[in-house]
Amino acid sequence: MKSEYFNHERQVLIYTPGGYQQFDQTYYDVIYVFDAQCREMFDLVHCLLNMACKPDPDGGRSTSFIIVGICSPNLWDINYFRNHDYLPMPLHGNNGLFKEGYYYGKSPDLKKFVKNELMPYVKTHYRTSGRSLGIGHSLSASFVLDAMITDDLFDDYIAISPNCYYDEYRLATDIENHQFKNRKAPRFIYASMSGEIDDGPDYWGDEWKAGWERVSKFLKDKSHFSENTVTSVQTFPGYGHYNGFMPSLTAALNDYIVFGAKNLVSYVGEETYPVHIELRGKNLTDPIYITGNQDALGNWEAKGVKMTLTSDSVASIDLRLHLPAQFKFTRGSWEREAIISNADAGNHIIHNAEHANRVYRLWERNHWMGE
């Protein structure tokens, strides 16, 4: 992609989940993966979601996401390198990663690129829900945490083996001083470290360990966060800085699915919006119900709210709903839940008022479970 913030094009990778073309009524959360120039890190995210994550046992939370990889280049011809992307300008002098001739100072521009150019591009070219997760490793994990503090860039954050001590523990200090309780909506924050903090061949030094200890101690203290924020802090002793990425990412993504199932399914905003929902199929007969995550949808009672049969092929309903609205269709019991052909498994979700008119289609071979 061309960018007004850089003198070079930004390489971006985009993965869409299986069924994306078929499931035209599903709008997907987006995961932004940094350091995607290491292709294995980008590929691990969608592979682990499909192969190593336990699905929500209640069937409400899908493991399908759009994955966007942001590559950080090494461009010798213009003297631009990975560390430029992930480090700000120093506040405490030119030492450590900020020595004269080192590479730093463009992290504010990378944030602007993501917020002002990449996210709008993804939104206009793909069916997105509006919810986002940022994933980083090592210095890109530091960038992800810094973006949480300075720009509130994503909704959720996974930081694996972050450098928390650069620029005289700047990131650790910023996290300790940030007012996390100001955010009331659900949020997931995961941070981990491998053998970098343990005595042995993988030890990365006392400063690295001290920075991590400050950040991990803060994140573990629930009193710093609102009740809708879930933090998970883990360590993986015996793994090195690089081979610890996979076990940590596996744990993080599984925690994230659990967070979604427990915290996102029940959450709704304060405002209500007009919504029109149709269910289409052949030879429809009464009764057909819609049920979901709020009073106007019957609060997940199997006989939630009866839909109007406008013909033998269309049932519809008009409601004012809090968003995100999550719902399913039944014939009056959970044993007779609708089988939908044009939406992903899990709850059907209306995330925002831009996509408040929905048309769902029953599977032609079998409309309902148990029939």
Residue positions per predicted region:
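Aromatic-rich carbohydrate-binding modules that target alpha-glucans
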Residues: 281-324, 332-353
